[in-house]
Amino acid sequence: MNLFSCQPVQPGDAPALQYLYASSPRYFQTIAAPIPLLEDVTRELESALSDPRRQLEFVVVSGERIGYLDLKFDYPQTGDVTVNLLLIAETQQRRGLGALVMRDLERRLSGRVRKILAGVFFENSGAAAFWEGLGYHFAVDARPVLSWYAKELGMQPARETAQLEAAQLETVQLEAAQLETPQLETAR
């Protein structure tokens, strides 16, 4: 069984995050940016971890960090959460893991946030299709650089939220159990 978990990124995790970035060169080609150097990632983490609205998580499968989730709460408005980045290592893509991570995030945030937003850089039809496949709709046109997709979660009473979370968690766990994810070598 290959269940994933999301684990908080710590200040000393810059080398692991930089390794994950380096294992995803197509993403950086798509956004026309070089793969960040370790010193750039170190500064990025220092800045993000000092912002109380940011939440950074590694996506972990079988003890290996194979993805990264960068969130900003109450942005652009109170009650919103923006996915700054959902990155799954290229060797782990096209297996449904990104969708599982987002379903799990939606479950965790259900009843606590109004909506989730995600930006798609440039004309990235694959990313747009990913978000649309998860029920996100085109929300804001900031082209040529960025298009925003959004999904309303809605606030719910605590009792209904707990029941929904239990049902959604069971679904996510069943889907995760069906994944066959080979190991990704990580820098130590």
Language-model regions: role of each:
Residues A99, Y149-G154:
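Accessory recognition modules or surfaces
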Residues A99, F122-V140:
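Conserved active-site alpha-helix within GNAT-family acetyltransferase domains
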